Design a protein with these regions (language model features):
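Acidic, glycine-rich calcium-binding repeat modules characteristic of RTX/beta-roll
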Residues: 163-167, 172-241
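Low-complexity acidic/polar repeat-biased segments
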Residues: 136, 146-151, 155, 244-289
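Hydrophobic residues in beta-strands and at strand termini
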Residues: 13, 64-65, 90, 117, ...
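Residues in Ca2+-coordinating acidic/glycine-rich loops
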Residues: 159-162, 168, 266-268
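Cross-family detector of peptidyl-prolyl cis-trans isomerase
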Residues: 1-158, 162
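Predominantly extracellular/luminal cell-surface or secreted proteins
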Residues: 35-37, 205, 232, 261-265
Length: 289
């Protein structure tokens, strides 16, 4: 893509939302990532590949339409919605024009920004509006995402409407995949996992990723017919015994009463447990062993 190939401002929605529509005079709180057309990053508060904040960076706030940011932002974000993630392709005349910005942005450079709208303070109001789960299609009551579960969450990571890879921290995470073929790996801690629409994969790489006690186990809240749970890293040989009792053979995996359990050493007791609320039946095809 040549330096001058962006001739007009274009906006692509990477994550849809039904949140409040943005308008001039709103104070916005956003995360962003900026790149040149060659893919070279020149500034960012957030990495939209790892879905992690950049070290030492915090969200950025500004008043929409007040000239506090480049014209491409003021024009491209007007009419978008709270909770959306949008990609702005901005021609140079709506960016910095002939002005070079340090050693990072040459003169006459079109720019690409990915922007997530985290919150909005409407003009003249005193209380900001934050994203609601329902705005991005998460029906908390239907899924069983209770206040009690949310109270355990220490970190939330929400993907795009693409094929995302979400990796939790070593704590209790809430990972939300939304649309696309997503891979969710909560890691250590009692994680809450929501794949969303699409053929999702729930990855486990250590027994400690989901513990036996109720307070330490993961919850997969929306496991669907096309989803799979990957346990291949836990042992060389695993066998699914449906709802049968553990027989004393190492590597048996069973599912009963909305609970997936693994007896890794053949002692007829589980060393790994995942809760699947609302799932009445699990097939062998749902497991990667």
């Amino acid at each position: 893509m040549s330096q001058n190939s962006v001739t007009e401002l274009t906006t692509t929605v990477l994550r849809k939302s039904k949140g409040r529509k943005l308008q001039d005079g709103d104070r916005l709180l956003v995360h962003y990532q900026g790149e040149l057309l060659n893919g070279e990053q020149f500034d960012a508060s957030f990495d939209f590949s790892s879905f992690e904040p950049e070290e030492g960076r915090t969200p950025f706030d500004f008043v929409l339409g007040a000239g506090q940011v480049i014209q491409g932002w003021d024009q491209g974000l007007n009419g978008q919605k709270l909770g959306e993630v949008v990609e702005l392709k901005i021609p140079s005349e709506l960016a910095y024009g002939e002005q070079a910005i340090g050693d990072t942005i040459p003169s006459n450079s079109p720019l690409i920004f990915t922007v997530e709208v985290l919150a909005v303070l409407p003009g003249g109001e005193a209380v900001p509006i934050y994203l609601d789960f329902k705005d991005i299609g998460i029906k908390t009551k239907k899924l069983g995402l209770t206040d009690e579960l949310l109270a355990t969450v220490q970190f939330t990571q929400t993907g795009l409407d693409l094929n995302d890879e979400l990796n939790g921290r070593d704590q209790a995470d809430l990972l939300i995949g939304l649309k696309g073929k997503d891979t969710l790996h909560g890691g250590l801690g009692a994680d809450v996992l929501i794949g969303g629409k699409g053929k999702d994969r729930f990855l486990y790489t250590a027994l400690e990723d989901s513990l036996v006690n109720e307070e330490g186990r993961d919850h997969i809240l929306d496991f669907g017919k096309k989803d799979k749970i990957n346990l291949q890293a836990l042992a060389d040989e695993l066998q699914f015994i449906k709802k049968g009792k553990f027989s004393g053979t190492a590597g048996e995996v069973r599912f009963a009463k909305e609970t997936l359990s693994l007896d890794i050493d053949g002692d007829q007791s589980a060393e790994f447990v995942v809760a699947l609320p609302g799932v009445e039946k699990l097939k062998g095809s749902h497991l990667l062993l």
